[in-house]
């Protein structure tokens, strides 16, 4: 499938490419070596407004999945961990957007978009590791909530 980049997509690509080269690449080796959470990279992504890329405008976003993919690609060229900060921030967005109530969407999506809330997810079980197809844990609806 071929996508034509809009002028906005190209502008975002150029900004992200420059930031990746000038600010992220010099830190990439240290981030990998220390195996610590790169708070400075999270702050950089937040300050640049990049967390907003895939979010609908009504939640403070730019509504551009293609620009989000471009950002991951550009950061991924120089530092997997920085690119992954975007992915981790966006995973709950999709889950909440697809299955969340209006209240949950209104409560969580703006904060995920502006970076004031942190995205997170978990997929590991002792018998399956991170193979989501092998996960056996289930949430069953019962009176008063769910049983895991």
Located regions from the model:
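Conserved acidic
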Residues: 8, 12, 37
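Glycine-rich, Trp-frequent "lid" loop and neighboring beta-strands that shape
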Residues: 60-62, 103-148
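Internal helix-loop-helix
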Residues: 47-116
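N-terminal capping segment at the start of a domain
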Residues: 18-29
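Short secondary-structure junction/hinge motifs that connect adjacent elements
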Residues: 27-48
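Intrinsic disorder at enzyme termini
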Residues: 1-8
């Amino acid at each position: 499938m071929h996508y034509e980049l809009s002028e906005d997509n190209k502008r975002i690509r150029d900004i992200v490419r420059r930031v990746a080269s000038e600010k992220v690449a010099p830190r990439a080796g240290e981030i990998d070596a220390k195996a610590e959470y790169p708070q400075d990279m999270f702050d950089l992504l937040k300050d640049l407004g990049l967390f907003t890329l895939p979010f609908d405008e009504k939640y403070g976003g730019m509504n551009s999945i293609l620009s989000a993919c471009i950002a991951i690609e550009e950061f991924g060229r120089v530092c997997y961990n920085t690119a992954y900060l975007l992915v981790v921030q966006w995973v709950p967005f999709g889950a909440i957007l697809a299955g969340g109530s209006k209240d949950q969407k209104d409560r969580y999506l703006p904060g995920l978009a502006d970076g004031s809330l942190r995205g997170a997810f978990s997929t590991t079980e002792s018998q399956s590791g991170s193979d989501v197809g092998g996960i056996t844990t289930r949430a069953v609806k019962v009176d008063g909530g769910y049983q895991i």
